Curated annotation (Swiss-Prot):
Gene Ontology molecular function, alphabetical: carbohydrate derivative binding; glucose-6-phosphate isomerase activity; monosaccharide binding
Reaction(s) catalysed by this chain's protein: alpha-D-glucose 6-phosphate = beta-D-fructose 6-phosphate
Functional note: Catalyzes the reversible isomerization of glucose-6-phosphate to fructose-6-phosphate.
Designated gene of the protein: pgi
This protein's UniProt keywords: Cytoplasm, Gluconeogenesis, Glycolysis, Isomerase
Keyword Plastid in record: no
Record organism: Alteromonas mediterranea (strain DSM 17117 / CIP 110805 / LMG 28347 / Deep ecotype)
Example GO biological process: gluconeogenesis
Main localization category: cytoplasm
NCBIfam families with a match to the protein in the record: PRK00179.1
Protein name stated in the entry: Glucose-6-phosphate isomerase
Metabolic or biological pathway, per its Swiss-Prot or TrEMBL entry: Carbohydrate biosynthesis; gluconeogenesis; Carbohydrate degradation; glycolysis; D-glyceraldehyde 3-phosphate and glycerone phosphate from D-glucose: step 2/4
Length: 549
């Protein structure tokens, strides 16, 4: 038995869960008309209704007791103070420093990092202004109109999804094209549609050697040179976000156009850094800064609000409740706003890369479930497909619904219909429809009793399906920044409870190593005996299909 599962607070929650499982939320709402009023929170422009969760006062108290027993507050403060909480890599975890608008120093190995953070923001601001004003021109004197942002993982998802979500704030001066996958179809589609004389490539890779990112950048360089540019002209058309200055300058990028990255910022937390340069180029620096300001506001809420009134803490503990005491294997995100459709993919990486672990900080195997599968899609599309599983499937799938109360450029009818579907889904999941109600609906349909009962069983909706609902006045940069930071801190809370290192990703690293080894095999540069029989067979088929004809 692990330290966690032997805690009295854990055992207490097991007992409470056994009792709660026999209760139905619709009865709780009937018995307590103030339930919705009591189970709501508001922070940083985000309203949270968590009343449609399978928790009562005993469960909530038990969860907060567990958080304190796991020293959540102490570990939270350790992260913000720059302690090396990424124990396997010996690193501080300080993405929060990138959005620190206070006068507080942030020390890494005794050095205050804030001057460099501020200098980088100023550099992003100045570079953005030079592109938007037309001051920075291509080598033929034409202004830059297209940005090709090349990255992968956190250096791709964060900028792309933030830019999509804030599309109403897009500037007219440039168009940003995001490229990640090493599948050549994407980079070739992008490059074939733009003028090389009006294009700036932003290459984002801490090492300047990430396989997919480097290959796509080399392809862009080859396209640029074949189109008429020279090696000397690259300095006006390529910039880098990287800590490997030598590799970037050897490539042809001007040292003035290299933006820094730091070891104390993980990839999935990097949109707040110079990795966010494409966001600034797409939306303007003030809107990029607005993202940081919203995240900073959520940081302050997370570090100062009592646990019982702390939105990320509450969300993290609800996740623990369902994953560990209700065997919920996944969690679904349902943004009812088209521009926010990419958020599930962003949180998927954030959560699953952080807490997809099976050993504790001490290297011991866990004896409890950890990170859930994160998935989702925009509403109302999902209602016509996978919502069926959420409503009538055999497992528990907690859901996060989110909706802006006001949206740009829409008539009232569209948005009212969107909102009604969002709220209606949360009610249907909670309330369900009983067998008796379904049986009564079939009265007068010309069915015998056996057939009525059979059909009623199929139509029955059990309800008691948990959900959170997030509302915000409109999706501003500040609100989006707060929303993303909220999920970051939720993931941190769950990692603390599970005693995981949420800030490494050795599974990802292994994939990179093996990918390079297999590439050598495909290119005939590695002994086939280095690979298992199955992989040998796959390599052989690929080589045969691509052999010179």
């Amino acid at each position: 038995m692990s330290v966690l599962t032997s805690l009295p607070e854990w055992k207490n929650l097991s007992d409470i869960a056994a009792s709660v499982k026999s209760a139905h939320m619709r009865d709780w709402f009937a018995q307590d008309t103030s339930r919705a009023d009591k189970m709501q929170l508001e922070a940083c422009g985000i309203f949270l209704d968590y009343s449609k969760n399978r928790v009562n006062e005993d469960a909530l108290k038990g969860l907060f007791d567990l958080a304190r027993a796991c020293k959540l507050e102490t570990l939270r403060d350790a992260m913000f103070s720059g302690e090396q909480i990424n124990s396997t890599e010996g690193r501080a975890v300080l993405h929060t420093a990138l959005r620190n608008f206070s006068d507080r120093k942030v020390l890494v190995d005794g050095e205050d990092v804030m001057p460099e953070v501020h200098a980088t923001l100023e550099k992003i601001e100045a570079f953005t202004a030079s592109i938007h004003s037309g001051e920075h021109k291509g080598y033929t004197g034409k202004p830059i109109k297209h940005i090709v942002a090349i990255g992968i993982g956190g250096s791709f998802l964060g900028p792309k999804i933030m830019t999509e979500a804030l599309k109403p704030h897009t500037v007219d001066a440039v168009k940003v094209h995001f490229v990640a996958n090493v599948d050549g179809c994407h980079i070739h589609d992008v490059l074939s549609s733009i003028d090389f004389e009006e294009t700036l490539v932003v290459m984002s890779s801490k090492s300047f050697s990430t396989q997919e990112t480097l290959q796509n950048t080399l392809t862009a360089k080859d396209w640029f040179l074949k189109s008429g540019g020279t090696q000397e002209d690259i300095a006006k058309h390529f910039v880098a976000v990287s800590s490997n200055v030598k590799a970037a300058t050897d490539f042809g990028i001007s040292a003035d156009n290299i933006f820094p990255m730091w070891d104390w910022v993980g990839g999935r937390y990097s949109l707040w850094s110079a990795i966010g340069l494409p966001i600034s180029l797409a939306l303007g620096f003030e809107n990029f800064k607005g993202l940081l300001e919203g995240a900073f506001e959520m940081d302050n809420h997370f570090t100062t609000a009592p646990l019982e009134e702390n939105m990320p803490v509450l969300l993290g503990l609800l996740g623990i409740w369902y994953r560990n005491f209700f065997d919920a294997q996944s969690h679904v995100l349902l943004p009812y706003y088209h521009y926010l459709r990419g958020l599930p993919a962003y949180v998927q990486q954030l959560d699953m890369e952080s807490n997809g672990k099976e050993v504790t900080q001490e290297g011991e195997s866990v004896d409890y479930p950890t990170g859930p599968i994160i998935w989702g899609s925009e509403g109302t599309n999902g209602q016509h497909s996978f919502h069926q599983l959420i409503h009538q499937g055999s497992g528990v799938i907690p859901a996060d619904f989110m909706l802006p109360l006001n949206v740009p450029n829409q008539d009232d009818t569209h948005h009212a219909m969107l909102a009604s579907n969002c709220f209606g889904q949360t009610q249907a999941l909670m309330q369900g429809k009983s067998f008796e109600e379904c049986y009564a609906d079939l009265d007068g349909k010309g069915l015998d009793d056996a057939e009525r009962k059979r059909l009623a069983a199929h139509k029955t909706m059990p309800g008691n399906k948990p959900s959170n609902t997030f509302l915000f006045d409109s999706l501003t940069p500040q609100t989006l920044g707060a929303l993303v930071a909220m999920y970051e801190h939720k993931v941190f809370v769950q990692g603390v409870i599970w005693n995981l290192n949420s800030f490494d990703q050795w599974g990802v690293e292994l994939g990179k190593v093996l990918g390079n080894q297999v590439l050598a095999g495909i290119q005939g540069e590695a002994d086939k005996d280095n690979f298992d029989a199955s992989t040998q067979q796959l390599i052989a088929k690929f080589r045969a299909a691509n052999a010179p004809k």
